[in-house]
Curated annotation (Swiss-Prot):
Matching InterPro entries: Sushi/SCR/CCP_sf, Sushi_SCR_CCP_dom
Highest classification ranks of the organism: Viruses, Duplodnaviria, Heunggongvirae, Peploviricota, Herviviricetes
Zinc-finger in keyword set: no
Organism: Equine herpesvirus 2 (strain 86/87)
Protein name: SUSHI domain-containing protein E3
One Gene Ontology cellular component: membrane
Domain called Sushi: residue spans: 35-97
Keywords: Disulfide bond, Host membrane, Membrane, Signal, Sushi, Transmembrane, Transmembrane helix
Positions of transmembrane segments: 145-165
Length: 174
């Protein structure tokens, strides 16, 4: 079943001069050339939706019915070529039936006999030995609170420097 399309494809050309051949909108003239699109065939076991945005394009989008898979492009657009007239960008897709096969696994109704015998007593079972890790000692170069002597010396120097700057530049505070 084919549907007659009542819309037109448009070729829009901007004329004008610009840097490196780019069109200049202020000096451009709009030339509108339209041709009727040919009828686009419908697809078997699928649907198509027609989209038209005023003057830029006409587009069909396709999807397949449940149980079918789309083979080909999911859309096609009508465009105008000066030498060829209007053409659709892609050929019609097709909807191919999905091959869903299920494999039944054989089931067994037989039962496995229970093994009788002796099993180890959980109370008397030996467990792997755990090795205790001795805590590591602080390196010798760290002091009581975990700081190196250089960190404490640097901190004292910074405090003395700040006190000297305050007293020198701002005068005695007392």
């Amino acid at each position: 079943m084919a549907t007659e399309v009542q819309f037109a494809c448009a070729l829009v050309v901007l004329l004008g001069c610009g840097y490196a051949g780019t069109p200049t909108p202020s000096k451009s003239t709009l030339i509108y050339n339209s041709q009727n699109c040919t009828t686009y065939p419908s697809i078997e076991n699928g649907q198509s939706s027609l989209y038209y945005n005023g003057s830029w394009f006409i587009r069909y989008e396709f999807n397949c019915s449940s149980g079918y898979e789309l083979q080909g492009w999911p859309y096609t657009t009508c465009i105008f070529w000066p030498k060829n007239g209007t053409i659709w960008t892609n050929g019609p897709p097709s909807c191919v039936k999905l091959n869903i096969t299920t494999t039944l696994m054989p089931t067994s109704t037989s039962t496995t006999p229970v093994t009788t015998g002796t099993f180890p007593d959980p109370q008397n079972t030996t467990h792997p030995t755990h090795h205790t890790v001795k805590p590591t000692r602080r390196p010798i170069n760290l002091l009581r609170f975990g700081y190196t002597p250089w960190a404490i010396i640097t901190l004292v120097v910074i405090i003395l420097l700040v006190v000297w700057i305050v007293n020198c530049c701002m005068g005695p505070m007392f």
